[in-house]
A protein has these predicted regions:
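Active-site HxH/HxHxD metal-binding segment of metal-dependent hydrolases
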Residues: 59-123, 238-244
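A general structural motif
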Residues: 38-39, 64-67, 90, 154-156, ...
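A glycine-rich beta-to-alpha transition motif near the start of alpha/beta enzyme domains, typified by
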Residues: 1-6, 48-63
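Zn-dependent metallo-beta-lactamase
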Residues: 1-38
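Metallo-beta-lactamase
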Residues: 4-7, 10-13, 43-49, 97-256
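A short, polar/proline- and glycine-enriched secondary-structure boundary/capping micro-motif
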Residues: 25-27, 52-58, 168-174
Length: 257
């Protein structure tokens, strides 16, 4: 994805960047800059900003002096945390337990992103949600399904990494079945906990997400694209995504209950 900064809504900017699989295929990544109600800013996830994008960020944040926090929501998005902290050292650094484990020398805030205390700190600006029926980090670290989803209340913009997929890319990714529609990440079957009730926990979480975030206006998905939403379209899209993973959930119930 091109390294650009795009204003998606009032107070919400999406920064896209490159992540190459095998050094060849660019699947893209994202970070978001969000203005708080008090006029200050936070980052959602980290990225090493190219000079033109950093100039835009610094113009908005007064060279970073108005940047309160860097909130790293996906446990496997760790490549750019050190650069982000070194560039904006006065911003409080938040991460998941895996961020703390993999980058122990960074000055992480004690509150971890998977803890309810994060909403206590930023709940006026964001709603947060984590998929149920699975761990945030699976034993198989090739499975990147789960993450902390964030909804910017003012703009209705959802920042999500991996859990929800919306592809709008050229070949060869255009050949994938999830292209052009909002879907759950294809590793759901590997992400579900091997225990009774996990499939139902996930289904109930997804239904609740669709209801609670029904007024979302767009989904900004890492590696992928932005899906603009019609009025209360999100519950319908979540219902469709659930329908497509019904065989996965049924197989899990048959094996574990």
């Amino acid at each position: 994805m091109p390294e650009t900064m795009t204003r998606l809504a009032d107070g919400f900017w999406r920064i896209t960047g490159e992540v190459r699989v095998g050094g060849v295929l660019d699947i893209g990544t994202q970070s978001s800059l969000v203005r708080l109600d008090n006029g200050r800013f936070v980052f959602l996830d980290s990225y090493t900003l190219p000079a033109p994008v950093r100039q835009q960020v610094d113009a908005l944040t007064d060279e970073g002096r108005k940047l309160d926090a860097i909130i790293n929501l996906h446990p496997f998005h760790t490549l750019h945390c050190e650069w982000m902290h070194s560039t904006y050292p006065d911003a409080t650094l938040y991460g998941t337990a895996r961020h703390h484990e993999k980058l122990p020398d960074l000055p992480w805030h004690a509150t971890r992103c998977e803890e309810p205390a994060l909403a206590d700190k930023f709940g006026d600006t964001f709603a947060f949600s984590q998929p149920k029926g699975m761990p945030l980090v699976c034993d198989d670290e090739s499975v990147h399904f789960s993450s902390i989803l964030a909804l910017h209340r003012t703009s209705g913009t959802m920042h999500v990494d991996d859990t929800l997929v919306y592809l709008d890319k050229g070949f060869p990714l255009s050949a994938l079945p999830m292209t052009g529609r909002l879907s759950f990440h294809p590793t759901l079957d590997k992400a579900l906990s091997p225990k009774a009730g996990a499939a139902d926990e996930f289904r109930d979480w997804a239904i609740e997400l669709g209801i609670d975030w029904a007024e979302a206006r767009r989904v900004a998905a890492a590696h992928n694209a932005v899906r603009e939403l019609g009025e209360e379209e999100f519950p319908t899209l979540i219902g469709g995504a659930l329908g497509r993973v019904k065989p996965v959930l049924d197989r899990h119930r048959a094996e574990y209950g």
